[in-house]
Structures are given as structure tokens and as C-alpha cells.
């Protein structure tokens, strides 16, 4: 169960870090936005290593679904933009795919 906590915290810090770069480079904010960006992205990487998984690629693939959920949440809450129907459909498809990766049977180690 702690995996979900690590995934959601990692997503929060990854999105926050990328958003800080977005604010600096796309919105013309101060270069000081780079400081929280780098701190957030470092925390993202560290948190993702706490996930209990045998293979990094499988952990990252499962994380992708949670990242998309968090991104649509960020869009709605932080940027105050109402997600479109296509956003919700894409989110659902990605969560289904990530669930197959996360909960699917393991027939081999490869």
C-alpha cells in the first residue's frame, strides 16, 4: 500500500518541478523558479526509488497511470481548467493499462 503513497508523492513533485520550469520558460517568470523546480524534480526521483518493484521499467510504467491522474488533477485544481471529455477518456485508458501492468500475472522474470 505504501507504493501508492510513493507514486502519488512522486507525481506531485514531478508535476510541480516541471510546472516551475514552465512558469519560468513559458510564462516569463523569474529564473528563481529553477530552484524549486530542481528541488522538486530531485524529490520526485528519490521518491520513485522507494517503490517496491523488482524492475524499474515496470515501476515506471505503473507510475505513468498515476502521473496522468495527478496531471489531470493539477489541471483542474492548480490551473483551474475544467478537463474535457477526451481528457477523462484518455485518463481512463491509461489507468486501465497501468493496472494491467501493475496487477497482471507474472509468468516469467523477463
From Swiss-Prot:
Localized where? Cell inner membrane
According to its record, how does it sit in the membrane?
Multi-pass membrane protein
Q: What is its main location?
A: membrane
| Protein keywords | Cell inner membrane, Cell membrane, Membrane, Transmembrane, Transmembrane helix
Which InterPro entries does the annotation name? UPF0060
Q: Which Pfam families match?
A: UPF0060
Q: Which GO terms describe its cellular component?
A: plasma membrane
Q: Which residues cross the membrane?
A: 5-25, 31-51, 59-79, 84-104
Give the family, as the similarity comment puts it. Belongs to the UPF0060 family.
Q: What is this protein called?
A: UPF0060 membrane protein PFL_4337
From which source organism is this entry?
Pseudomonas fluorescens (strain ATCC BAA-477 / NRRL B-23932 / Pf-5)
